[in-house]
Regions:
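Short glycine-rich hinge loops at helix-strand junctions in the catalytic core
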Residues: 88, 105, 128
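Charged, amphipathic alpha-helical coiled-coil/dimerization segments
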Residues: 87, 99, 108-110
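Acetyl-CoA-dependent GNAT
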Residues: 1-76, 81-83, 94-96, 100, ...
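C-terminal "cap" of GNAT-fold acetyltransferases
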Residues: 5-9, 14, 107-110, 114-127, ...
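Active-site acidic-Proline motif in GNAT/NAT acetyltransferases
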Residues: 81-83, 87, 115
Length: 154
């Protein structure tokens, strides 16, 4: 598995994100899907990671972004194609984004997910995330699960 920072503005990534959007809309109403669009993913304070099978030019099977701010790095748009799951892809994406957060001086990584995604919550917990309260501009809603990982002293 090859995992590196790449532009999200490529057809395979756009297709993968469309799959993620379609999946999330089967779980949650549109007003509770807090997704970043393509222009937002291309902002300078956002790092976008891509996982490829078979090397640097292989098929894209996963992606994830981190929005860097002085307070924390927020994980967004983590998705692994069903055919690529169970191979450490999500773990690899999170590890690369954690390095970026540390390099940017972030003390924490945070994320918002939903209760209908127990597999995702399990991945985050295995990576050291713990549940926390709402952060940023998110409303405190029962259809949101907020998690954080402290990066200092880890």
């Amino acid at each position: 598995m090859h995992i590196a920072f790449e532009t999200p503005n490529q057809p395979e990534v756009i297709s993968l994100i469309a799959d993620l959007d379609a999946y999330q809309l089967t779980l949650y109403p549109p007003e509770l899907v807090y997704a970043l669009d393509l222009p937002s993913l291309m902002e300078p304070h956002v790092k976008f990671a891509v996982a490829r099978e078979g090397g640097a030019s292989g098929k894209i099977v996963g992606c994830c972004a981190i929005v860097l701010s002085p307070e924390y790095g927020e994980i967004k748009r983590l998705y692994v194609d069903p055919a690529g799951r169970g191979k450490g892809t999500g773990r690899g994406l999170l590890s690369l984004l954690e390095k970026a957060a540390l390099e940017a001086g972030c003390a924490q990584m945070v994320l918002e997910t939903g209760p209908s995604q127990p597999e995702a919550m399990g991945l985050y917990e295995r990576h050291g995330f713990q549940r926390c309260g709402a952060f940023g501009d998110y409303p405190d809603d029962p259809m949101s699960v907020f998690m954080r990982k402290d990066l200092v002293n880890t």
